[in-house]
Amino acid sequence: MTTISHPQDILLGAQAAAPVLPVCDHFSGQPERMRKSLQLQAQMTAELGRCVFDVTLDCEDGATVGQEVAHANAVAALVREHAAAHPDARIAVRLHALDHPAFVDDVARIVGQVGDKLTHVMLPKAETVDQVDWVARALDRAYGPRLPLHVLIESPAAVQQAFAIAAHPRVQSISFGLMDFVSAHGGAIPASAMGVQGQFEHPLVLRAKLEIAAACHAYGKVASHCVVTEFKDTAALAQAARQASQRLGYTRMWSIHPAQIRPIVAAFAPAATRCRSISSCCASWRWRRAACARHAALRRRRRPCATFTVR
């Protein structure tokens, strides 16, 4: 019986050394939905034997205007409660943007209180590596240990900084923010480019996605694909996830509805036939390399020794 090796144990290069993260990052911001998302994570972890998606509790899009402090307190309380019952849960938080008045409160009330229970922090609307560095220091002051940063790139200017951001040692993953990216073009990109099909066809959107993926692979970080706003047509969602994975080089993808999680996980899973093919190819290469090494060793042993005549 042939043993199938995992691709991460076979493939070489920067991405092979990247952190291993669940292939789906599920965002939820409303209190009841946040709780249900964490419950679903626990259920699927028990079902599949490992955690296959992260839950990111959303402050940026989840907090009601004027209720940001109350929302941050609720997020911290939920993290504390759920982590007590499920110590292995993978919970993250998306803060408000650096220039938002609620950013400081988010850091103090969430990272400062339950930072030890978070897997990472998502920073939206990052424009430069200097901003990323500033946020990293702010997190350190609030919590201490070095929490990984996931960075959300959402503008044409930020795309130009993708390689510099990916090179930052605290950055673990970069995500692409499609809707704000399209909006930042002031009408130059049509709304159709945000659709399940158009976002894989429009040249400027494709260029941005590829730039982010290339930056991540260059520095061993995880490229996380943007959300697809398709909830009912699972075939269309699965096709989008396969394109993100197989055409664009992304190894992770956002979801914003529970119905999206399983299709994304399935689409990003390598086919068993592909794993067998790669494993067999690499095993053959290793066998040939070992055979060449043995042959070279035998030749060295058989080489005649130099003789000297003593007069």
Question: How would you describe each model-predicted region?
Answer:
Residues 1-311:
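Expand to "…catalyze enediolate/carbanion chemistry for C-C bond making/breaking, isomerization
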